[in-house]
Regions:
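Acidic, two-metal ion nucleic-acid-processing modules in DNA metabolism proteins
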Residues: 1-278
Length: 278
């Protein structure tokens, strides 16, 4: 991954103090040195990480819901105590159909139920609200979970805590490849994937936004919904052109503006400049 301590150490001569390790660091600097620090640390990243390392989640075992039993959880207890040098196992549950989602803990967390071939699994996702959950009942999802045992009224239950989730069938290699190419292009470097959103692609994106009456989830969530029709960069530039043309507004969420006339997207500065660079 990106070594934040190494990056900050590279700027040590303009810092009043600093410390940390590869995953976290703290520092102090004078106000007059903020601009210099910003340039130095960004130059370090560009020179040492032309493509930023991909954040990965290790799945220790792919698991069918039918093998999600108390016996399994009890056997996992033999591996304790878990910690930095002995990570708690993460299990992958793939191609489950979402059957129920409910807010718990004053709306700060989610209780999620999903099923596969008649076997239902109950899970909890902490620090995620209903407004942040982009999926609907009937969607097919993959889950990465940690398992433990909880006891209520003298009865033991399986506790499945969701570490991460995603839509099933996602081509994650395509996502990272296209995202990296887009970011490198923004830095002035050549790209290997299509970036220009032609009329048909713009139509796909705009029709989807209209069908959803805007979009309240993340850019990546929107990309995964449309990934079969476009590239990461094409979506990014299409949204930029929409906003410039007054079709949408982006303030966290995407909202559709009430537009009475057709917009000529090809005449936007966004697409004119893009076409000139390609």
């Amino acid at each position: 991954g990106f070594n934040i301590f190494e990056a900050i150490s590279n700027c040590s001569d303009i810092l009043t103090h600093f410390g940390g390790h590869p995953l976290a660091a703290g520092m102090g600097l004078n106000v007059k040195d903020i601009a210099a620090f910003r340039k130095r640390i960004n130059d370090f990243a560009k020179n040492n990480y032309p493509v930023m390392p991909i954040q990965t989640l290790k799945i220790d075992c792919k698991l069918s819901p039918y093998y999600l039993t108390l016996d399994l959880v009890n056997n996992l207890a033999e591996l304790e105590p878990f910690g930095t040098d002995n990570a708690q196992p993460v299990f992958g549950l793939y191609n489950l159909t979402l059957t129920n989602v409910a807010a718990i803990g004053d709306g700060k967390h989610l209780k999620i139920e999903a099923a596969k071939k008649g076997k239902s699994v109950r899970m909890v996702k902490f620090r995620t609200t209903l407004d942040e959950f982009p999926h609907k009942i009937g969607d097919t999802l993959d889950f990465a979970v940690k398992l433990s045992k909880s006891t209520f009224k003298n009865k033991d239950y399986i506790s499945a805590q969701i570490v991460d989730f995603r839509k099933s069938g996602i081509d994650i290699d395509k996502y990272y490849r296209e995202k990296n190419d887009y970011l490198l292009f923004k830095l002035g470097k050549k790209n290997k994937t299509e970036l220009y959103p032609n009329r048909d692609i713009c139509a796909v994106v705009y029709k989807y936004l209209k069908s959803q009456k805007g979009y309240k989830y993340t850019f990546d969530d929107l990309y995964f919904e449309l990934a079969n029709y476009l590239t990461y960069g094409q979506l990014a530039f299409a949204l930029d052109a929409f906003e410039e043309a007054g079709l949408i507004k982006r303030e966290g969420n995407i909202t559709l503006n009430d537009v009475k006339t057709k917009a000529n997207l090809e005449r936007t500065d966004t697409l004119t400049v893009l076409k000139g660079r390609l």
